Swiss-Prot record:
[2Fe-2S] cluster binds at residues 107, 109, 125, 128. This is Cytochrome b6-f complex iron-sulfur subunit 2. InterPro entries: Cyt_b6_f_Rieske, Rieske_2Fe-2S, Rieske_2Fe-2S_sf, Rieske_Fe-S_prot, Rieske_Fe-S_prot_C, TAT_signal. It comes from Trichormus variabilis (strain ATCC 29413 / PCC 7937) (Anabaena variabilis). Keywords: 2Fe-2S, Disulfide bond, Electron transport, Iron, Iron-sulfur, Membrane, Metal-binding, Thylakoid, Translocase, Transmembrane, Transmembrane helix, Transport. NCBIfam families: Cytb6fFeSPetC (NF045928), PRK13474.1 (NF010001). Pfam families: Rieske, TM_PetC. It is found in: Cellular thylakoid membrane. The gene is petC2.
Amino acid sequence: MDDTLNQLNPSMSRRQLLNFFTGAIVAATASAAIYPATKFFMPPAESTDAEGGVLAKDKIGHPIPASQILVQASGTRALIAGLAGEPTYLTVREDGTLDPMGIVNNCTHLGCTFPWNPVDQQFQCPCHGSRYDAQGSVERGPANRPLKLVHVQVKDDYIWISSWQETDPRTGEKPWWV
């Protein structure tokens, strides 16, 4: 009888070692390639204040200092990226402050974006001809609802935009967007 124990070979063969390292290199390369792609498709986390507001940003995503907008003439409308990146108009008031009510730049007819016309003192939608006054109320259709409002607040030279949940001051009713 043979007294030697019949053991499996505990050491790894050269082929197994090379397969292991090849798999590890492929996994590391795939992870390195997938990471930037997932970062591209995932939006960055918004910085919010205690009321759930977000910082006003320019078109490339940098926060806009309030002082940059407040140096403009009264009545100027600045277009910024507000809640969920929605284009939002901010207005410089006569006293050199920002109007606490911002107007979201999406037509309530079909969602087109539009410019402020300083000559006519209107928002004019180029898609189907809707017209809105300086406060965002409908002056001419086909749109039948006023423009969405947001709260605007300046804290430490930063502009914070937050959702408007209260009664719409233009209609005296509950906002349609809530």
